[in-house]
């Protein structure tokens, strides 16, 4: 027979009483009333925050968007096929956040920071909220450093500075993405962390871009965020904020970053789809009333931080696709008004073989000229004016039969300058190369070269200077200024090469 010891029993009871946890865990649970088309209506979620993450019974995550009197409207971050009417939903107490850190560099992730490149999990413990407030007025400083794109037409006429927002706008198939990718490739020696955000694009297109970046060695400093065309509208809407959050982490560490949103038209369409399904009232072109705000709060996060905060920067290159060149549509005008300038790509120029097909007349950079390198500012100051006057004369000369010698000379130079600015894809130029060809074009050295030989001349001149005028290359690379010595060397080099080329 087992002997029962009262003191032992009382000590066990005492232990149980002492270790009793009085805390009450409240679980906020609701019921799905209706689900479909990537949205759900939920009844019974009494205490839920706007934009809070919700967890459905099958593990799908949603975001609470509409907080109404008797129900909550949520958008889903998955297909939602496992969610049924009457199934339960619980709040998580969290707003959307993603992992951040150095481990993200070189990876391809989705809108929630989950890896989709098949290279295994990302070992990052730090997280950051997707929606962060933009830096205030005191936290910013004026744009003062150049962001070299490697594309002569942009760096000479529409210069971009670190911390600027420069819109790339044009019809489909005019080379918008090519400009963005060239800019990433050109940052190889610049110590800039790049983030490329692909919104609503074909998976094959994104794969091709990743291959190009890998081949050029650019994935070593680039993060790709992809929300493909077959992903839910919620993920396409969140993708740009994910890109901004990843770049922000590095910006506040004092680094320079570059974010490309390709393209924000698709994000606006995804947001329109979500809003209409949530029964929000439509406005112009059926977009909801706050479609301006989704872009302004995204692009305001790009900044050049003050020295007190480390002097880091986030440069944003948003892309917008126009329909038949209509820049006055709703989304294009919205984004033009938020950004610090735009690079307009023309279908006519593209089809005529002038690539990059930049229309210099209506492209502008509002703050970039303050950040342009001294050498480029000195050389290319009148390039934009020359090309604009040439375009005007060219249109006029179609109706005039006899032109005076000065007009003919201006037309001849304009044709050669336009040829000089042609540049193949994925081959950005360094500053000394851009300065050399701009100098040759604007100072009359190519006026006697046949138009069809100008591209060949530019390539040959760059090779000649690299081989024979290393001192010029060294001065430009180190000082970024066209000193008297550098200009003398450049003149000598151009004259020597021109004589040999003509012969």
Curated annotation (Swiss-Prot):
Gene Ontology terms: biological process: proton motive force-driven ATP synthesis
Pfam families: ATP-synt_ab, ATP-synt_ab_C, ATP-synt_ab_N
Record membrane topology: Peripheral membrane protein
Catalytic activity field: ATP + H2O + 4 H(+)(in) = ADP + phosphate + 5 H(+)(out)
Site label Required for activity, positions: 363
GO CC terms, sorted: plasma membrane; plasma membrane-derived thylakoid membrane; proton-transporting ATP synthase complex
Chain positions recorded as ATP binding sites: 170-177
InterPro entries recorded: ATP_synth_asu-like_sf, ATP_synth_asu_C, ATP_synth_asu_C_sf, ATP_synth_F1_a_nt-bd_dom, ATP_synth_F1_asu, ATPase_a/bsu_AS, ATPase_F1/V1/A1_a/bsu_N, ATPase_F1/V1/A1_a/bsu_N_sf
Top EC class of this enzyme: translocase
Subcellular location: Cellular thylakoid membrane
Function statement: Produces ATP from ADP in the presence of a proton gradient across the membrane. The alpha chain is a regulatory subunit.
Quaternary state and interactors: F-type ATPases have 2 components, CF(1) - the catalytic core - and CF(0) - the membrane proton channel. CF(1) has five subunits: alpha(3), beta(3), gamma(1), delta(1), epsilon(1). CF(0) has four main subunits: a(1), b(1), b'(1) and c(9-12).
UniProt-recorded name of the protein: ATP synthase subunit alpha
